[in-house]
């Protein structure tokens, strides 16, 4: 097993966190759970006021907050959307979140927005482009961001840089951190037939500032082959739990978010899963001691 990575100064506490859903707000107010942080999607709060901000203000008074962007299209050819950049900056000034993150993906082209996180070609031109976009975002905020590794379903013949190496280069050139989505690693490993543990060993693990866990769906392609989809609509798969424990053996305890964006159950069911996250983190802390 590779040596454990040394940890950077943390932004989020090395505890279990949960993605905030407005339908859980009343339950949260009635009985605030013992969690380290909540995560929100930035684009849902780029309005001046209303119930969403009242709820977020309540959370911010009680928990660490992670702001997770889904629409900047850091991997795209288009210039970054100035309105989204301004919205991120306003959120940062208003709430001083403990972490701000985005995806290694694209979602805009020729001024049109696509409601998905689409894969990029891993070549030198893309590396320069993504670095420039990360630099622009970080300069806007005045702080480093975390960049999330993607779940992918296709690979491009034009790619000549390994994804893990691409992420290493981005971290080295821009000073950004890594949001390590363990479910995405597993999904991509199954879809493309690579070794998930070997992939993890090639990542810049000392730069990991947050981990994501989520459920996935299993489908079949036109040829009948199994394809995993990063659906966020089911409990975390046992294989992903195993990979998460392996990851913690490499990184030590890291703030870990449970994501659930579809088929959302009552809060109690999600808190049971975050309890398992907390147990994994406690074991990781004991090993690190």
From Swiss-Prot:
Disulfide bonds: none annotated. InterPro entries: MbnB/TglH/ChrH, Xyl_isomerase-like_sf. It holds the Pfam family MbnB_TglH_ChrH. Belongs to the UPF0276 family. This is UPF0276 protein BPP1075.
């Amino acid at each position: 097993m590779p040596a454990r990575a040394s940890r950077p100064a943390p932004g989020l506490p090395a505890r279990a966190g949960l993605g905030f859903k407005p339908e859980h707000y009343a339950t949260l107010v009635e009985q605030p759970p013992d969690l380290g942080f909540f995560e929100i999607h930035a684009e849902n709060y780029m309005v001046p006021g209303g119930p969403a901000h009242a709820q977020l203000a309540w959370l911010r008074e009680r928990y660490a907050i992670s702001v997770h962007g889904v629409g900047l299209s850091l991997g795209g050819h288009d210039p970054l959307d100035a309105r989204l950049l301004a919205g991120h900056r306003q959120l940062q000034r208003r709430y001083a979140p403990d972490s701000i993150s985005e995806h290694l993906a694209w979602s805009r082209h020729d001024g049109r927005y696509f409601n998905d996180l689409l894969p990029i070609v891993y070549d030198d031109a893309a590396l320069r482009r993504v670095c420039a976009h990360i630099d622009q975002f970080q300069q806007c905020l005045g702080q480093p961001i975390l960049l999330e590794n993607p779940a992918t379903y296709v690979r491009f013949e034009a790619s000549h840089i390994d994804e893990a190496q691409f992420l290493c280069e981005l971290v080295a050139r821009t000073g950004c951190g890594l949001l390590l989505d363990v479910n995405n690693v597993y999904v991509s490993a199954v879809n493309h037939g690579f070794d998930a543990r070997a992939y993890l060993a090639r990542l810049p693990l000392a730069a990991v500032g947050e981990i994501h866990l989520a459920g996935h769906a299993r489908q079949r392609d036109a040829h009948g082959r199994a394809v995993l989809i990063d659906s966020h609509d089911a409990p975390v798969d046992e294989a992903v739990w195993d990979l998460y424990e392996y990851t913690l053996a490499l990184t030590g305890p890291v703030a870990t978010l449970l994501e659930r964006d579809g088929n959302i159950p009552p809060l109690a069911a999600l808190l049971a899963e975050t309890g398992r996250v907390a147990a994994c983190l406690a074991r990781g802390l004991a090993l690190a001691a």
